[in-house]
Amino acid sequence: YGPGDNYHPENSHVIPGLLRRFHEAKIKNAPSVRVWGTGKPRREFLYVDDMASACIHVMNLNNKIYNKFTSLMCSHINVGSNFDITINELAKMIKSVVGFKGKIKFDKTKPDGNIRKLIDSKLINKLGWKPKVSLEDGLSRAYKDYIMNKL
């Protein structure tokens, strides 16, 4: 997620979709924002600049270091934040970032999806990379991008 994301109201991912939904509710002084599901599923998010820095880090690795931690058939590298959050916690964080004063209403008639999505990022961490952008900071940056470029 981050600058350049898809903020379409019907076919975006959860962060850009919620940023837009909370922003529009704030502008309209709506009493609430509807969020799909129960809010219980956990998701991991990675800011776009962190993904880019991970790619550059791996491309710049010395071959000896890379080969020490990988093998021919096991050379894939997961990149993640090593942190997951419930959709409920995410919605509250986005509500705060946007400055929406209304309520969050979970629509339990809509699907939750998988209960947890958190990847194993141990290898990239062993190779010396860790994300730098916190979720809250990334959400603030993404919201500023939305305001500046999507309205």
Regions found by a protein language model. Give the residues of each.
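C-terminal substrate-binding subdomain of Rossmann-fold SDR/epimerase-dehydratase oxidoreductases
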Residues: 17-18, 24-151
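Flexible, glycine-rich beta-alpha linker
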Residues: 1-17, 41-42
